[in-house]
A protein has these predicted regions:
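Conserved RNA-binding domains used in RNP assembly and mRNA/RNA metabolism
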Residues: 2-82
Length: 82
């Protein structure tokens, strides 16, 4: 199964890159899983100052938009996580 790596703009104005998976959930519960999200600006793990987790549940209503990353950003991200 191929991973879906996207650049994600959150309602908080944060831009992250990572794998995103849609998951089934009850109404009002988080319905997306972000796997190994990194801040786009400095390619550092998202929320690294606050947690050691690398998977996060997030509600889709916190996502403004998603896009395919530029090839150089994707390459740099994949080098960081592997």
């Amino acid at each position: 199964m191929s991973k879906t790596i996207k650049v994600i703009l959150l309602t908080s104005s944060e831009k992250v890159i990572g794998e995103i998976v849609e998951v089934g959930s009850e109404i009002g519960e988080p319905d997306c899983k972000l796997i190994k999200p990194y801040e786009v600006q400095n390619l550092a793990p998202w929320m690294e100052d606050h947690t050691d987790q690398n998977e996060f549940m997030i509600s889709s209503d916190k996502i403004i938009t998603m896009a395919d990353p530029k090839s150089d950003l994707l390459k740099n991200y994949l080098e960081k996580i592997n």
